Amino acid sequence: MARNLDPKCRQCRREGEKLFLKGEKCFTDKCAIERRAYAPGQHGQRSGQRLSGYGVQLREKQKIRRLYGVLERQFRKVYAEADRRRGQTGENLLQLLEGRLDSVAYRMGFGASRAEARQVVRHNGVLVNGKRVNIPSYTVRPGDVIELAEGTKGHLRVKAALEAAESRGFPEWIEVDAKAGKGVFKAYPQRSELSATINEGLVVELYSR
């Protein structure tokens, strides 16, 4: 299966902001953005080049892809579905990305990062409505119950991720019983509940060209 093998800290530096790809490290002063807040590469510190309108749109799309750990082909499929749905395409896009099983598992604290949560899903560590689902892109629907498989609940990394997520607080659109390793996806998130640093409108403009 294709994967993005670029170092995670390098990806954050490329986008110029934290994408929270390395779990707890992103919340400490060891985060690469805290230490080297400039683009990677030989000329990163001197990079003052202005992007064209297309370049800005492309950069935003790449940022969202990296944030959610989605490859180009997958992203295009999600965008096409968002465009078919009623409502604003950009908001639909973010809701669909948040509704992926790997994203929901991450939000519920089943992994310290989306990549870690994705691995838990792939290794048959997550149940949806009582049935094992090992497809990270599986679409979770409002009302679905997501829980850790019994054999996964005791994993130290999973327990640590759950504790950290509980201490930070869970998003409003999910309800989690951290002790039971179980939660409910109550609804798709509203735009106001998601990161203000994302400009999904630029992606809509890019695909409308």
From Swiss-Prot:
Full protein name: Small ribosomal subunit protein uS4
PROSITE patterns assigned: S4
GO CC list: small ribosomal subunit
Keyword Cell cycle set for record: no
GO molecular function: rRNA binding; structural constituent of ribosome
InterPro entries recorded: Ribosomal_uS4, Ribosomal_uS4_bac-type, Ribosomal_uS4_N, S4_RNA-bd, S4_RNA-bd_sf
Gene3D superfamilies referenced in this protein's UniProt entry, alphabetically: Ribosomal Protein S4 Delta 41, Chain A, domain 1 (1.10.1050.10), RNA-binding S4 domain (3.10.290.10)
Organism the protein comes from: Azoarcus sp. (strain BH72)
Signal peptide: none
Keyword field: Ribonucleoprotein, Ribosomal protein, RNA-binding, rRNA-binding
Family stated for the protein in its record: Belongs to the universal ribosomal protein uS4 family.
Cross-referenced HAMAP family: Ribosomal_uS4_B (MF_01306_B)
Residue ranges constituting the S4 RNA-binding domain according to the UniProt record: 99-179
Keyword Ribosomal protein: yes
PANTHER family, per the entry: 30S 40S RIBOSOMAL PROTEIN, SMALL RIBOSOMAL SUBUNIT PROTEIN US4M
Gene Ontology BP, a term: ribosomal small subunit biogenesis
Role according to the record: One of the primary rRNA binding proteins, it binds directly to 16S rRNA where it nucleates assembly of the body of the 30S subunit.
